[in-house]
Amino acid sequence: QVFDQACKGVYDRAIFKKLDRVCDDCYNLYRKPYVATSCRQNCYSNLVFRQCLDDLLLVDVVDEYVSGVQIV
């Protein structure tokens, strides 16, 4: 599922796919179902999503992802 109905911001399919990919990659890294679920909670505005960015070595583009979270 690309779109989370709980998100109240702008619906932008490209941004959702990008944020969702982080959660998918993080799940593939750890293979724990709760990782994927927790990562998507609160429209990606949570500590698990931020930790996934770190774990996937995306720290140099964190601001880009954070601004995406703020849009959705």
From Swiss-Prot:
Modification type Valine amide: residues: 72
Keyword Disulfide bond: yes
Cystine pairs: 7-43, 23-39, 26-52
Keyword annotations from UniProtKB, A to Z: Amidation, Carbohydrate metabolism, D-amino acid, Disulfide bond, Glucose metabolism, Hormone, Neuropeptide, Pyrrolidone carboxylic acid, Secreted
Annotated positions of the D-phenylalanine modification: 3
GO terms for cellular component: extracellular region
UniProt PTM: Stereoinversion of L-Phe (in CHHB-I) to D-Phe (in CHHB-II).
Subcellular location: Secreted
Pyrrolidone carboxylic acid modified-residue sites: 1
GO molecular function, one term: neuropeptide hormone activity
Gene Ontology biological process: circadian rhythm; glucose metabolic process; neuropeptide signaling pathway
Keyword Disulfide bond in record: yes
SUPFAM superfamilies named among the record's database cross-references: Crustacean CHH/MIH/GIH neurohormone
Record function comment: Hormone found in the sinus gland of isopods and decapods which controls the blood sugar level. Has a secretagogue action over the amylase released from the midgut gland. May act as a stress hormone and may be involved in the control of molting and reproduction.
Recorded family membership: Belongs to the arthropod CHH/MIH/GIH/VIH hormone family.
Identification of the protein by name: Crustacean hyperglycemic hormone B
